[in-house]
Regions:
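Conserved catalytic-core segment of nucleotide-activated headgroup transferases in glycan assembly
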Residues: 1-72, 78-85, 89-90
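Short acidic/histidine- and often glycine-rich active-site loop of Leloir-type glycosyltransferases
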Residues: 123-134, 138-139
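A charged, aromatic-enriched C-terminal amphipathic alpha-helix characteristic of glycosyltransferases
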Residues: 158-188
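Conserved acidic donor-binding segment of nucleotide-sugar-dependent glycosyltransferases
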Residues: 136-144, 152-157
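Residue-level signal for the nucleotide or nucleotide-sugar donor/cofactor binding architecture
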Residues: 31, 107, 141-142, 175
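Short hydrophobic beta-strand element within catalytic cores of glycosyltransferases
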Residues: 108-111, 118-122
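Short glycine/proline-enriched, acidic/aromatic patches that form the donor-sugar handling elements
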Residues: 64, 85-86, 102-105, 125-130
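Acidic donor-binding loop of glycosyltransferase active sites
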Residues: 90-104, 115-117
Length: 189
């Protein structure tokens, strides 16, 4: 992972909380991303989700999702490529990661957490990462749960800012390449 210098200030206090979907729309996210967009559009509390959030999709293949959310009245943006990926993700508060297939540790998830974003993800998105639900990340069981999670976040932003900070500290400490290398090479002494 890469970390921005200076470190991002974790604060969900701008006019709207900025939600990021990062990575290509592909096999790993297709099923759950499609279901999440349907849930957002069909939500009974649509105005609440529109009023408090802006949604950005970073990566290729999200055109249909952006168009559908825009038609439903959401403030939605699409960035197909960011020349400085870390700088771009640091402009956001939350990263939703609807990965539905296990593939090991996710670099984009590590980047997000290490840079102070609150990651809301599936078990697959968070596998092999030193985080804990409701302590250093938010892990959902079913994709439809993300709608209720978003409703809770805007009602108590300081709680979720603290979770994001704990996540950042965990990643910087437990996924530190230099420390891990030293520990590994100590095994061979």
């Amino acid at each position: 992972y890469q970390v921005a210098k200076p470190a991002k200030v974790i604060s969900f206090n701008s006019p709207k909380i900025k939600v990021l979907f990062a990575g290509q729309y592909n096999l790993y996210m297709q099923q759950d991303a499609d279901m999440l967009i349907d849930c957002l559009i069909k939500s009974k509390d649509l105005s609440e989700l529109k009023e408090h959030y802006v949604y950005t999709f970073l990566g290729k293949g999200w055109d249909n999702h952006v168009e559908r959310l825009n038609k439903a009245g959401y403030e939605t943006h699409h960035i197909k490529f960011a020349p400085d990926y870390i700088e771009e993700i640091c402009k956001h508060d939350i990263q939703v990661t609807p990965i539905c297939i296990g593939t090991g540790t996710k670099g984009k998830v590590l980047d997000a957490i290490a840079n102070g974003l609150l990651v809301v993800g599936s078990w697959y998105a968070l596998e092999n990462i030193a985080v804990e639900h409701n302590v250093s990340c938010i892990q959902y069981e079913e994709i439809k749960d993300v709608v209720n999670i978003l409703k809770k976040i805007h009602l108590n932003p300081s709680k979720y800012e603290a979770i994001a900070e704990c996540g950042r500290e965990n990643i910087l400490q437990k996924h530190n390449g230099e420390t891990t290398s030293k520990e590994l090479f100590c095994l061979f002494k």
